[in-house]
Amino acid sequence: MKPSERICAALDFPTFAAAEPFARAVAPEVGILKVGLELFAAEGPAAVRAAARLGRPVFLDLKLHDIPNTVEGAARSAAASGAALLTVHAAGGAEMVRAAVRGAGPGVRVLAVTVLTSLDAAALEAIGLAGPPEAAVVRLARLAVDAGAGGIVCSPHEVAAVRAAVGPGPLLVVPGVRPAGAAKGDQARVATPAEAVRAGADVIVVGRPLRDAPDPAAAARAIAGEL
């Protein structure tokens, strides 16, 4: 995998019209474009189709978490929109993950989100998950992969442990990545792009450091250079 192919650019904008100049600038420099909740809530499948026209696989980051039948139908609809990757919450349980995989079909890789990168140990304890985040992440990752998930979303702090737990097959997608010197924002567990890849990440998700850069394409090239 070329360094640029490891970069997933997050289209964190309220509309595709707002996202399009950024998306067109970075598409030649990255491997994947990500449509998240804000953009999908505004424009639905049209946002996925518009992003896909830029010639890159689209990662639809909806973090589905519902009863299995509902998630299966949502995954089927996501596949019809043209998404290449789709997220669900591993905490929804093994049957929900299996339902997502059934609904998505063979053309879409279902990625299971373990623990959000905005949560630290204190936040996890407050919702009943005592102990270090790594233990919860590894447990959820194993559950999801055993249920058929094609990949795992986890923070750079846990990616090495997840790789050791699930083996070489699943795609490991890592948000919470910030180039050296960049602000952490609302992320609690972060690392640089190079640190994440050295730890075992296949794909790094980059949002604000690209979106807020004066020249997003140059910023993407700089990140690829770090890898």
Curated annotation (Swiss-Prot):
| SUPFAM superfamilies found in the cross-reference section | Ribulose-phoshate binding barrel
What Gene Ontology cellular-component terms does the record carry? Answer: cytosol
Q: In which pathway does it act?
A: Pyrimidine metabolism; UMP biosynthesis via de novo pathway; UMP from orotate: step 2/2
**Per its UniProt record, what Gene3D superfamilies does this chain match?**
Aldolase class I
Mark the transmembrane ranges: none
Record field: catalytic activity: orotidine 5'-phosphate + H(+) = UMP + CO2
What are the binding positions for substrate in this chain? Answer: 12, 34, 61-70, 117, 178, 187, 207-208
Q: Name one GO biological process term.
A: 'de novo' pyrimidine nucleobase biosynthetic process
Q: Which EC number(s) does the record attach to this protein?
A: 4.1.1.23
Which cysteines bridge via disulfide bonds?
Answer: none
Active site per database record: 63 (proton donor)
Q: Which GO terms describe its molecular function?
A: orotidine-5'-phosphate decarboxylase activity
Q: Which UniProt keywords apply?
A: Decarboxylase, Lyase, Pyrimidine biosynthesis
The entry sums up its family as follows: Belongs to the OMP decarboxylase family. Type 1 subfamily.
Quaternary state and interactors: Homodimer.
Q: Which HAMAP family did the record assign?
A: OMPdecase_type1_B
Tell me the function of this protein. Answer: Catalyzes the decarboxylation of orotidine 5'-monophosphate (OMP) to uridine 5'-monophosphate (UMP).
What name does the UniProt record give this protein?
Answer: Orotidine 5'-phosphate decarboxylase
What species does this protein belong to? Anaeromyxobacter dehalogenans (strain 2CP-C)
